[in-house]
Amino acid sequence: MFITPGPNNAMLTISGLKFGFKRSLPHISGIAFGHAIQVSLICLGLGFILIDYPGLQIVLRWLCFGYLLYLAYQMVGSIKDYKKESGRPLKVYEAALFQWVNPKAWTIAITVASGFMPLEEKLWIAVLFTGLMSSLVSFPCISMWALFGSLIKTMISNQFIKKFIEYLFAILLVLTGFYLVLN
């Protein structure tokens, strides 16, 4: 699930495109770190809060949808001059915090916790192991999206391709938001 399209991977593609792979590493690390913490807390029982209070899940979906709309709006026209980098990639803590309003991250975390956490082990060891493994698996998967973005950076000199990429990713973010809210 880490490698499939979603909010994190769309943002990483644009980060790789705008800032290159190396400068996107804090963003990648923040996602992996934030997700490991999220998985660990769900393994400790936080997932039951979402089950007991389904309204909270709806609130998370709408927060994520709003953020994705904001990102889509920011994305159009954001690739002004690929040689002059404006702005900055997300910092580790910003990417880690985004996981808490990302419904796909919640879905993955609950799936990982329910499907892969060894129940016969000591709880703390199992939680640490599950969180660590989640982070180790996610890192190369999400890194591929930033790498993809940095590779297509060379095509941005063509104005048509530049606009196409901007609008494509903006539309994909909006569609992802609609999918998250409607499901």
Predicted regions and their residues:
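Residue-level signature of transmembrane alpha-helical cores of multipass secondary-active transporters
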Residues: 31, 95-99, 131-138
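Selective transmembrane alpha-helices of multi-pass membrane proteins
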Residues: 51-80, 138-141, 145, 153-183
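Structural signature of hydrophobic alpha-helical transmembrane segments
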Residues: 1-5, 61-63, 132-140
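Hydrophobic alpha-helical transmembrane segments in multi-pass integral membrane proteins
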Residues: 41-44, 101-113, 171-183
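Membrane helix-loop-helix hairpins that form the core translocation module of multi-pass transporters
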Residues: 23-91, 148-151
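Juxtamembrane transmembrane-helix termini in multi-pass membrane transport proteins
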Residues: 1-58, 108-130
